[in-house]
Amino acid sequence: MTIEQILEAIENMKVLELNELVKAAEEKFGVSASAPVVVGGPVAGAAVEEEQTEFDVVLENAGASKINVIKVVRELTGLGLKEAKEAVDGAPKTLKEGVSKEEAEQIKAKLEEAGAAVTVK
């Protein structure tokens, strides 16, 4: 197995599977995956900020060209005409959940091009 294949296998694992993998590696090799304590580190109570990896795309409103927005929503979500119209009429509405930053930005660009107001959370 190449390093690339191993990384790909790890990338496709769920959180629970990764946790089990870490525990198994700790037991097998007699090591600990916990971070070492640093003297003089960040002030207690300071939040460690993790980089967000999954994003939600929220349609805030359809703007003036509602028909174009409905067409784009159908294209992006695979919804039928009625469901896409209901999603647009029901704004603010989350259209996509748990997508990568790149995909979220592409979706946002397409919707904004059609005239919609969109946020990525």
UniProtKB/Swiss-Prot annotation:
Keywords: Ribonucleoprotein, Ribosomal protein. SUPFAM superfamilies: ClpS-like, Ribosomal protein L7/12, oligomerisation (N-terminal) domain. The lineage of its organism: Bacteria, Bacillati, Bacillota, Clostridia, Peptostreptococcales. This is Large ribosomal subunit protein bL12. Pfam families: Ribosomal_L12 (PF00542), Ribosomal_L12_N (PF16320). Forms part of the ribosomal stalk which helps the ribosome interact with GTP-bound translation factors. Is thus essential for accurate translation. The keyword Repeat does not apply. Homodimer. Part of the ribosomal stalk of the 50S ribosomal subunit. Forms a multimeric L10(L12)X complex, where L10 forms an elongated spine to which 2 to 4 L12 dimers bind in a sequential fashion. Binds GTP-bound translation factors. GO terms for biological process: translation. NCBIfam families: L12. HAMAP family: Ribosomal_bL12. Belongs to the bacterial ribosomal protein bL12 family. CDD domains: Ribosomal_L7_L12. InterPro entries: Ribosomal_bL12, Ribosomal_bL12_C, Ribosomal_bL12_C/ClpS-like, Ribosomal_bL12_oligo, Ribosomal_bL12_oligo_N_sf. It comes from Alkaliphilus oremlandii (strain OhILAs) (Clostridium oremlandii (strain OhILAs)). One of its GO terms (cellular component) is cytosolic large ribosomal subunit. One of its GO terms (molecular function) is structural constituent of ribosome.
